[in-house]
């Protein structure tokens, strides 16, 4: 069965989802039937074809009136401001990928479903009242047909959760801290300008800028046993893509750095193949641009102090890796089937 998807919001993640769909060879499994975006069709086509981070798109892209052509495929372009006006029923949409970054609670999900979509996948953590939050590679097997409104978590949650799981399963995590070293984003300023967050009033290209993060809450949403046992901070740095995460955990069992690396490398080659990668090459952030993994462990940076404090450095392409996981989760949602009885919904 080919899953019919619509994309709401054609920004960084929305465009990368389309690119990843075609570049990963999953076009036979997923068809994009519509994209809803307030920008004009010319701008949408141009930014799909030319991307500063990811280069030129290999497929031919053009637009004609309110249609976007990718190769031989035709995608309908919409410019609806109100979710209730979206023609998902008319278009036979199975799953809406809401990549706006604006919508993310149950009411928004229900609006997509009322418009005719069978399921909704948000491209950010969303509210706690959604049916499920999925970190693909860790908990997607818990999805059920009645899970209609789902979050794909965040790029950083997808990056760090597999590593936390591996370390916890092997050594038993007692507590941890996370520092996200994240590339600049479009909620920052090119030059100094007003913002509700005074740190984000400053030019993104000229400073390392501390920002708020809900990553600790994202960790405990997937692993409730770590409630009040993880803390996180985040800084934005003057690069446009790729993120590094510094993870420090205190564990119950004594361990050596070489054993930690052996564990993570084995997982990358086995159970977490395609989700986690491992390297000991002397790489820098640009080398992970366009990497489809959720997490790439840098084995050269693993440290252990006092046999119980583990520090690791984990990289991710916060756009490309996450876009690929959006596609993985979409297929997982479709694979469990579509149950249209809203009263049957159970929370994951």
UniProtKB/Swiss-Prot annotation:
NAD(+) binds at residues 12-13, 81, 318. It is an enzyme of class 1 (oxidoreductase). The record marks 182 as: Activates thiol group during catalysis. Its EC number is 1.2.1.72. Pathway: Cofactor biosynthesis; pyridoxine 5'-phosphate biosynthesis; pyridoxine 5'-phosphate from D-erythrose 4-phosphate: step 1/5. Coiled coil: none annotated. GO terms for molecular function: erythrose-4-phosphate dehydrogenase activity; glyceraldehyde-3-phosphate dehydrogenase (NAD+) (phosphorylating) activity; NAD binding; NADP binding. One of its GO terms (biological process) is pyridoxine biosynthetic process. The keyword Oxidoreductase applies. Catalyzes the NAD-dependent conversion of D-erythrose 4-phosphate to 4-phosphoerythronate. Belongs to the glyceraldehyde-3-phosphate dehydrogenase family. Epd subfamily. This is D-erythrose-4-phosphate dehydrogenase. The gene is epd.
């Amino acid at each position: 069965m080919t899953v019919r998807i619509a994309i709401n919001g054609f920004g960084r993640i929305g465009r990368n989802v389309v690119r990843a769909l075609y570049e990963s060879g999953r076009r036979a499994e997923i068809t994009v039937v519509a994209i809803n975006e307030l920008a004009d069709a010319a701008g949408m086509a141009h930014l799909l074809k030319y991307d500063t981070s990811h280069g030129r798109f290999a497929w031919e892209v053009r637009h004609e009136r309110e249609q976007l052509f990718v190769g031989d495929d035709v995608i309908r372009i919409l410019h609806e401001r109100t979710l209730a006006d979206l023609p998902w029923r008319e278009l036979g949409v199975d799953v809406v990928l809401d990549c706006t970054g604006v919508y993310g609670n149950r009411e928004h999900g229900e609006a997509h479903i009322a418009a005719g979509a069978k399921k909704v996948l948000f491209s950010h953590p969303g509210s706690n009242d959604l049916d499920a939050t999925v970190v693909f590679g860790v908990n997607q097997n818990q999805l059920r047909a009645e899970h209609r409104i789902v979050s794909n978590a965040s790029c950083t949650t997808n990056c760090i959760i597999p590593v936390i799981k591996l370390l916890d399963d092997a050594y038993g995590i007692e507590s941890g801290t996370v520092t996200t070293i994240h590339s600049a984003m479009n909620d920052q300023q090119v030059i100094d300008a007003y913002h509700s967050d005074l740190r984000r009033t400053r030019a993104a290209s000229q400073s390392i800028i501390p920002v708020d993060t809900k990553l600790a809450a994202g960790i405990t949403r997937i692993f409730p046993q770590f409630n009040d046992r993880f803390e996180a901070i985040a800084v934005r740095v003057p690069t446009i893509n790729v993120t590094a995460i510094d993870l420090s955990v205190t564990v119950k069992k004594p361990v050596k750095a070489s054993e930690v690396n052996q564990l993570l490398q084995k997982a990358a080659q086995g159970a977490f193949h395609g989700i986690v990668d491992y390297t000991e090459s002397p790489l820098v952030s640009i080398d992970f641009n366009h990497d489809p993994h959720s997490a790439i462990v840098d084995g050269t940076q693993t440290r252990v102090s006092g046999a119980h404090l583990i520090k690791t450095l984990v990289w991710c392409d916060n756009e490309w890796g996450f876009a690929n996981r959006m596609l993985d989760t979409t297929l997982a949602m479709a694979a469990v089937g579509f149950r249209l009885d809203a009263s049957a919904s159970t929370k994951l």
